[in-house]
């Protein structure tokens, strides 16, 4: 967090494009700051529904699902798969089986299919945990994200997020903390 904030202090123009800081705030429990970071990122990239999902998740922690859904960012342009479908999921318009059916029906090339599934498993897992309270199902999807070939072999920032979120959900499940 401090390194990201220092980057922005040294180069203020970086603030609007700094989605990583928003995710950092989210995992530190600074949900208002996280939501704000995702709001200003939208000025930088008005297509990226992944950003809108993080804003939604931050707002859920502050004010609940109903209010967060009422405040979802409106997108006008298309986005990369699976984000339009994931956004529909977070809006409450589809369920995970429909999302996965759409991915499989798209018949993407193998490597791209793996990439799309990684993102779907990650966000469906978080959705099931956060919105539906289905911890066991969430854990299974997060495990699939972590073991996904694309995620494992690229080691991207989002794969690290998946790994950390999966570890957190496992920890809570083991010691049976209320969620």
Please state what every model-predicted region is.
Residues 6-7, 40-41, 75, 145:
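Canonical positions in the second alpha-helix
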Residues 2, 29, 63, 132-133:
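Residue-level detector of the short coil/turn that links helix A to helix B
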Residues 10, 44-45, 78, 113, ...:
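Structural marker of alpha-solenoid helical repeat scaffolds
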Residues 27, 61, 130-131, 165-168, ...:
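Register position in tetratricopeptide repeats
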């Amino acid at each position: 967090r401090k390194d990201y904030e220092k980057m922005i202090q040294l180069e203020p123009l970086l603030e609007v494009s700094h989605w990583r800081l928003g995710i950092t705030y989210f995992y530190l429990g600074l949900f208002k700051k996280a939501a704000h970071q995702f709001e200003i990122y939208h000025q930088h990239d008005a297509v990226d529904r992944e950003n809108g999902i993080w804003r939604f998740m931050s707002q859920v922690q502050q004010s609940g699902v109903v209010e967060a859904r009422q405040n979802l960012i409106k997108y006008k342009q298309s986005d990369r798969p699976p984000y339009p479908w994931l956004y529909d999921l977070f809006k409450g318009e589809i369920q995970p089986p429909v999302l996965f059916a759409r991915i499989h029906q798209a018949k993407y090339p193998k490597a791209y299919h793996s990439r799309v599934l990684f993102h779907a498993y990650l966000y469906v897992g978080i959705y099931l945990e956060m919105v539906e309270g289905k911890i066991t199902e969430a854990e299974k999807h997060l495990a699939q994200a972590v073991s996904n070939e694309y995620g494992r072999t690229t080691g991207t920032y989002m794969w690290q997020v998946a790994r950390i979120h999966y570890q957190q959900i496992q920890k809570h499940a083991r010691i049976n903390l209320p969620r």
